[in-house]
């Protein structure tokens, strides 16, 4: 190749290659230091868009899982309260059965059973009025069509209603077991109340396992898969990147050496002129 004073083509090519290598080296260093292979849109416009959409869904699923966990806690609190109500109803039922045994009961015994039943019914109403999750009443009838956000997006929700379970709502607040006939009627009412509470507990159990926990399992599976996909797309593969960084360092060193050699051609021209 001839020597030229105005344009050193070899030097220009070497400078261009060195600039490209330096840029790639800087990008590789950024990936290694941040742990991300996509740090800005210029790194991969399409990849960044996909990654951000995945991050949005990951955030939504994480929030939904927390919502479900709180929902499970609320349902378990309500079911525990209903369990207490059921235990009290069984005690009331025992008193009604005892009062219905006319052959061995006198008026004093019937009155004592009635008084004891009254205390138990008051406890049932107290539990109904005071069972709460946080500040939310669960068993007083105000928990009606309450919404649970169980998915990552709008509309992915479900609702639950828990009926009032105080003595009046269970139609047992006015039972009278001071007579045999009254005790028999009370037994029918108490049995109906026990069935109502059992159905409510069954509904809560089905809602917890069939809706909340099943959805949580599905959300968790989606979350794990999305996190893996987002990581593969955005996170740095250190083994690959270190190899790339090492290779680029060598290219940069070679380009620097070539540039130095190319610039020596200008000195050759000066030497020739000096003769």
Please tell me what each predicted stretch does:
Residues 1-275:
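Primary detection of the long, small/polar-rich alpha-helical "axial" segments characteristic
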């Amino acid at each position: 190749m001839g020597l030229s004073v105005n344009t050193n083509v070899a030097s220009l090519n070497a400078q261009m290659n060195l600039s490209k290598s330096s840029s790639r080296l800087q990008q590789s260093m950024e990936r290694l230091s941040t742990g991300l292979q996509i740090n800005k849109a210029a790194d991969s416009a399409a990849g960044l868009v996909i990654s951000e959409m995945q991050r949005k869904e990951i955030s939504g699923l994480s929030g939904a899982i927390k919502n479900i966990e709180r929902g499970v806690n609320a349902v378990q609190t309500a079911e525990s309260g209903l369990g207490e109500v059921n235990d009290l109803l069984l005690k009331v039922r025992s008193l009604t059965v005892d009062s219905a045994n006319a052959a061995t009961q006198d008026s004093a015994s019937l009155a004592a059973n009635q008084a004891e039943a009254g205390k138990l019914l008051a406890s049932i109403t107290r539990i109904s009025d005071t069972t709460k999750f946080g500040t939310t009443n669960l068993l007083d009838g105000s928990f009606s069509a309450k919404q649970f956000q169980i998915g990552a997006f709008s509309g992915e929700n479900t609702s639950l209603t828990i009926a009032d379970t105080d003595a009046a709502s269970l139609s047992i607040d006015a039972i009278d077991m001071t007579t045999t006939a009254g005790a028999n009627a009370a037994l029918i009412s108490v049995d109906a109340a026990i069935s109502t509470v059992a159905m409510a507990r069954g509904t809560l159990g089905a809602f917890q396992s069939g809706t909340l926990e099943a959805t949580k399992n599905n959300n968790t599976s989606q979350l794990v898969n999305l996190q893996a996909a987002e990581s593969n797309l955005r996170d740095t593969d250190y083994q690959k990147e270190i190899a790339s960084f090492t290779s680029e360092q060598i290219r940069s060193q070679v380009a620097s050496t070539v540039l130095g050699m190319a610039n020596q051609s200008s000195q050759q021209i000066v030497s020739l002129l000096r003769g």
